[in-house]
Amino acid sequence: FLERPHIETTVWVNQQELGMQNSLCVPHVYDLTAATTPGKTYLITIRIDNRIKEINVGPDSHSITDQTQGNWNGIVGRIELQATPKVHLEDIQVYPDLSNQKALVRMNIRSASSTKGEITLSAASFNTDIQHKVAPVHQSFNIRPGDNPVEMELPMGKEFLTWDEFSPALYKLTAKLTNGKQTDTQQVQFGMRDFKIEGKWFYVNGRKTMLRGTVENCDFPLTGYAPMDVASWERVFRICRNYGLNHMRFHSFCPPEAAFIAADLVGFYLQPEGPSWPNHGPRLGNGQPIDKYLMDETIALTKEYGNYASYCMLACGNEPSGRWVAWVSKFVDYWKVVYTQEPPLETAGNGNLTMSIM
């Protein structure tokens, strides 16, 4: 698990290459299972390559530009070896449904063999004076080897707490998989939040809301990269709140997970973006690799951070040039389909996402 590499990583176990990843928005995660055996010693080699290759996000993109963080080389944040049971949960996505007083939970069970067991879901608030515990629900499973999608509903009850800038109540969802004598427990942070457009107004949980925002350009000159800890981002958002703001746009970059955690706690609406300003060099919609890369990146960051209540808006990037109108139209159409389905088709925990084309 490599939380924030910059840019491209290639991983080897001894002499066996496991692959390459180049996301600027989400962690690079490599599965070492097939290349390792318990009880043996291995050499893990990671190569970081920050050269701009065929995928060119643009020299002024704030994900790489020398004007802000710079095109540094390395990994910041967590670097971990993570062990999981042979039967385990992954990709847990929570979709709050305020009108029906429930949350839809989708997840995947990964298993090396056919097996059966039970999943238990529960939730409890954790950051407010008023405490609310959700009664657990159970569901049995009988699965095959590989990936097994599972969907469950978690009734929240009439007294559930909502999240917004005034009262940012949060829940910890606990998902416990029981398989014989083995268990796997995962926790996910989420908020009961609804963010919609009606006419020309934004509404948060039915309340008409004015967004009073600022732009964040990855301006951290003392380090050259965005903070990876929650406390630093809490400080940023609380300073913004002291100036009467409630919203932050991240210009042509996506902040790390710590920013979403902090914004959840403070009560701040966030708009991450695809990591590109496809104007000075690359062009959007001209068939260049940036077309697919931006689509892949926005899907990946929504999957990675979509459970956080503060993630409310998304833009593909900043001020494109080229045949961008047709490309952006398809981009918007894709996300409209994703977020107008009931339940949503794609992973983005809170199920309400406003598109912004910068």
Predicted regions, residues:
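Accessory beta-strand-rich segments of carbohydrate-active enzymes
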Residues: F1-H88, A112-S113, R249, C254-E257, ...
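Beta-strand-rich binding/interaction modules
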Residues: V13, K102-F141, V150
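Conserved, mostly hydrophobic/aromatic
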Residues: Q15, I79, Y171, G206, ...
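Short strand-edge motifs at loop-to-beta-strand transitions and within beta-strands
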Residues: V26-Y30, G146-M152
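Short glycine/proline/serine/threonine-rich loop/turn segments at secondary-structure transition edges
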Residues: T36-T41, E54-I55, M156-L170
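Surface beta-strand/loop "capping" patches
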Residues: A83-S114
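N-terminal carbohydrate-binding accessory modules
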Residues: T174-C240
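Substrate-binding/catalytic cleft of secreted carbohydrate-active enzymes
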Residues: F237-R238, H247-M358
